Regions:
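Intrinsic disorder/low-structure terminal segments
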Residues: 6-7, 39, 54
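Long, compositionally biased
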Residues: 43-69
Length: 69
């Protein structure tokens, strides 16, 4: 498994914990909103910043997509 994928799994699990939600449900939501790949591709930025900042960014990404739907 690549470092990028390991971090993505870690991020997904920590984000789900932060949201008091199941990781499977979070991933399904991201897939539905078509943001999973975008979040995965943000590895370079996300792995060097505070995890809370990453969570806030993911919240914004999801909110923007929900507004468009």
């Amino acid at each position: 498994m690549s470092k990028k994928m390991k971090f993505f799994v870690y991020l997904l699990e920590k984000y789900a914990e932060w949201k008091n939600e199941n990781s499977k449900n979070i991933l399904e939501k991201w897939d539905k909103l078509l943001v999973t790949e975008k979040i995965f591709d943000m590895y370079e930025m996300y792995h060097i910043e505070a995890i809370e900042n990453t969570f806030e960014d993911i919240e914004l990404i999801c909110a923007e997509k929900e507004e468009l739907d």
